[in-house]
């Protein structure tokens, strides 16, 4: 067994999307099937322009009744602006989240369901 090494992804930023329309809202915007997202399985997805050009990529985590999106700080403001633009009359709340951190792990790690959310990066 190898000792795990943690690297803090200091360029990661988070936002949350919650509300009764959050599932449908994300399903209509992103490049992955939001229904595959669960507490134990995060998704890697993208937001594209109406012409199909890349705007942002992110990971999506499901936590209770809300979704957490993690993206690079370079794309964060653009992503937040576009999601708020597309919100229209959807019953969703989009909020910035400041108390979360992202880490890359190298080596073996035992999964503790209560304290860690992790999966293999599909990129």
At which residue positions do the language-model features occur?
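Basic, glycine/lysine-rich polyanion-binding surfaces/domains
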Residues: 1-123
